[in-house]
A protein has these predicted regions:
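HIT superfamily nucleotide-processing domains
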Residues: 1-110
Length: 110
């Protein structure tokens, strides 16, 4: 499989890890759009949210809470974004969520 995020999970491509558990990996975005910009991905490959099962989405939700706390954005707020499909502008076809925060974000959907 030629998936960028699967290669990161396998350790073939380095990342700046923020958090990891059995099901989810969270790491810093290489092109941050906010002072805090972390990607959260399931370790099991799935193309997008349409392929995600309940157990995986629950694990991602718990990881989002943990990362928001670790990054110090839980109290003041943050944004979660997941693009799905071509019209949703999904660029990497492995389910992922962007956690953005660390400053007052613009109204523009990032």
């Amino acid at each position: 499989m030629d998936c960028l995020f699967c290669k990161i999970i396998a350790g073939d491509i380095p990342c700046k890890k923020v958090y990891e558990n059995e099901q989810v990996l969270a790491f810093r975005d290489i092109n941050p759009q906010a002072p805090v910009h972390v990607l959260l991905i399931p370790k099991k490959h799935m193309k997008n949210i349409l392929e995600c099962d309940g157990e995986t989405i629950a694990a991602i939700q718990k990881a989002i809470v943990k990362v928001a706390e670790l990054e110090g954005v839980a109290a003041d707020g943050f944004r979660i974004v997941s693009n799905c499909g071509e019209n949703g502008r999904q660029s990497v076809h492995h389910l992922h969520f962007h956690l953005l925060g660390g400053a007052r974000l613009t109204e523009k959907m990032a």
